[in-house]
Amino acid sequence: MTDNNDDKTLNAPAKKTLTLKPGGMNQGTVRQDMGRGRTNAVVVETRKRRPHRPEDEKPVQPVVAAPKPAAPAPVAARPQAPQPRIHQPGGQQQRPGSSQSQQRSGSSAPQQRQADRPRGNVLHDLSAGEMEARRRALMEAQARDVVEAKQRAEDEARRKVEEEQRIAAEKMEAANRAAEEAAAAKVAASQPAAEVRAEPASERPAAAAAPAPRTDARPQSAAAAPRSAPATPDAAAPRGRRTGGDDEDDRGAVRRGSSLPARGKVVAPAPAKPAARLKTEEERRRGKLTVTSNLEEDGTPRGRSMASMRRRQEKFRRSQMQETREKVLREVILPETITIQELSQRMSERAVDVIKFLMKEGQMLKPGDVIDADLAELIAVEFGHTVKRVSESDVEEGIFNQTDDEGEMVSRPPVVTIMGHVDHGKTSLLDAIRQANVVSGEAGGITQHIGAYQVEKNGHKITFIDTPGHAAFTAMRARGAQATDIAVLVVAADDSVMPQTIESINHAKAAGVPIVVAINKIDKHEANPDKVRQQLLQHEVFVESMGGEVLDVEVSAKNKLNLDKLLEAILLQAEILDLKADPSRTAEGTVIEAELDRGRGAVATVLVQKGTLKPGQIIVAGDQWGRVRALVNDKGDHVKEAGPAMPVEILGLSGTPSAGDRFAVVENESRAREISEYRQRLARDKAVARQTGQRGSLEQMMSQLQTSGLKEFPLVIKADVQGSVEAIIASLDKLGTDEVRARVVHSGAGAITESDISLAEASNAAIIGFNVRANAQARTASERAGIEIRYYNIIYDLVDDVKAAMSGLLSPERRETFLGNAEILEVFNITKVGKVAGCRVVEGKVERGAGVRLVRDNVVIHEGKLKTLKRFKDEVNEVPVGQECGMAFENYEDIRAGDTIECFRVEHITRTL
């Protein structure tokens, strides 16, 4: 070690465990002259120089102390050349320069150190910065010592563990080798015993007599450890491996002793180690390959490595384990479909065995092939496992079947749906109740969206759902009827019962909800409420005035007449129904409408039917999921919670769900994502199955095109809300015929984007925007690609324009008009003209340029046009009945006397849907 006073001491213990230290790296401090009497202490790393050759080492003459009268001045020790260690029988080893030189060098060592200590001149005291640098360097050195000590302890512990493992492996190999030798002894029993014993007896003296030291061609350094066999008894085992500790300590001792000539100190010679016998081929194959052992062997080929030995042991261990291995029977969970590879993993069987079993059953499959649950169950049972079949739809279990706590049930507001025919005043009636004006904001004066509102009457809340009355919005009316408690059927007193009125009655009956009839527009002179009541009887709606149980109220939305009576009738019906809900449970409900807002993202209008919905909860709505970011009521205010029968807008969904989907609150995001992915995958599978069913094979497609000639009108539809998209698609489906139909390439809620333009360009489709517009990028892309974008805000106009465009795809109707018949009397062959038929018109007339058919024996031989029509030698336009004429066909001359010529006119008429 090196201290700050440059006092170097050398400790050479007899035996010390080899540890990892920085090789030749120490830290020291030097003083740097900064000029003008200033100095600076700098911490540097010093590296010891180790000579590689004996002649490189320069002997250092020690400083002789002052002579004493009793003892003569010591003589400086001269550096000795490195001598090879000689193995002696007694295990003793002598080194030149015995104990006397040791005593002399030992007694003179303190005097040499005292004389070698440098005596510098102190220029000035250290500054505070220099003291701090020294203190910091000292602390860093101490910290490094602690880390190195910890590292040495860890290395020592790891080395002990490895040594124990190696000893255990050697014991196992020794046992295996003993078994192999015993087997070999039985085989070689016929050989003479003396010959068998001669081999090991002759090997041992040879190994003992082998010279231990071995010189090399190049000069070796004094610090290099002489290569010799270990002297420890355990190292002389049959394997012939030297232990790492002794060899390392020996080399370390020699290395430490290499600097003895410089200090004039001699270390006691180590005892000589006996020579080791040469390793056999089997021992070399089992031994560990190192650089030292590889250089020590004399020309023998290198054997197996340690990794090869470990692989052999592992293979032997596996073979032993497989012999006594017992089959483990498991419970295998089988979904609806599973791959063979996954099935084999769940059974802990090899996929090859499963493939072999299937081959025996006559099925050639690969590990990646998908099989159904029935075949998977057969395979699992055949391999002895028990089967538990599950369905993918099990992920939806427990969402909507939660039971309500009877003790927590409280009264809730009724949900009322306004239904009826278009333009019968449904929205106007609701506006009069809400004291709002929604009708003025509706395009065309008709409702094209489903809306939900909540009003309060005498301290009681009532939730109203306004549904469209147009024929295109059948699905909306059906959803409104399913999510409601009471249906208010609005019938105009001047228009009576209409088709959508009948449809609304059927929806209410199918949903099993009571009906309250509101006879509107009684302020008109032509109003006839009694006629309305009588017509309702035909559809099994019996009002109270006719002896039934259905409440009816005559109202006027325009003059706001009897609106309070209508609300009282609704509250009376709700009291009869005794509507209750549990607000403490998790929320469930129905999606009334969904849209994609540019600033807020996906927005869903929902009706909470059970429980209480709060911001921050995770919900699943259809195939979409999300965390509720905000709740907005019908007035546009943010609310902290939504109780039963309360309509709110939800922000935070990942996408726009379909109108009519049910939503529920789930416990965590993973469950919500799992349910959403399952539903999306199910929707994709259905779409693929639908397309596959429509597409069929190539032969079916060609036959359909040849027979039916079906033409498609591709469209990309974007609307403001999901319900409008649904209504538009339903209306366009009704326009389709056997020859032409509308094909919706893509539909969705939201503005027209650049991706829609790309899709329309790829499919050669037109783009329809309903209450939405295209952004600037989409408009630029459409102009560049030549894609037409049509904007609409009334569904009537949209359907009419698409109908007209689809009519243009219809092939025109071919209408044929019979003109007359002519009989060929004689055929003339005229030069430069060809054959000309002399005919007499026997029926109707014959016109020039009309279509003709040549009929022979009641069989049509040719169909074409007339080339010439002459009466005598003059060209005429037509020949009436009873007159004779000459006719020639275009590109046809196979005419004979007695044939009949049929003349007709063809007209093409444009068709409409």
Curated annotation (Swiss-Prot):
Region (G1): 420-427
Segments for region (G2): 445-449
Region named G3: 466-469
Residues covered by region (Disordered): 1-322
Biased composition, class Low complexity, residue ranges: 60-113, 181-195, 203-238, 261-277
Bias (Basic and acidic residues): 131-180
A Pfam family per the record: GTP_EFTU_D2
Region (G5): 556-558
Annotated stretches, region: G4: 520-523
Gene3D superfamilies in UniProt: P-loop containing nucleotide triphosphate hydrolases, Translation factors, Translation initiation factor IF- 2, domain 3
Domain tr-type G: 411-578
Keyword field: Cytoplasm, GTP-binding, Initiation factor, Nucleotide-binding, Protein biosynthesis
Signal sequence range: none
GO cellular component, one term: cytosol
Binding-site residues, GTP: 420-427, 466-470, 520-523
Subcellular localization, as worded in the UniProt entry: Cytoplasm
GO molecular function: GTP binding; GTPase activity; guanosine tetraphosphate binding; translation initiation factor activity
Matching PANTHER family: TR-TYPE G DOMAIN-CONTAINING PROTEIN, TRANSLATION INITIATION FACTOR IF-2-RELATED
General function of this protein: One of the essential components for the initiation of protein synthesis. Protects formylmethionyl-tRNA from spontaneous hydrolysis and promotes its binding to the 30S ribosomal subunits. Also involved in the hydrolysis of GTP during the formation of the 70S ribosomal complex.
UniProt xrefs under NCBIfam families: IF-2, small_GTP
Family, as annotated: Belongs to the TRAFAC class translation factor GTPase superfamily. Classic translation factor GTPase family. IF-2 subfamily.
Record-given protein name: Translation initiation factor IF-2
Upper taxonomic lineage: Bacteria, Pseudomonadati, Pseudomonadota, Alphaproteobacteria, Hyphomicrobiales
Gene: infB
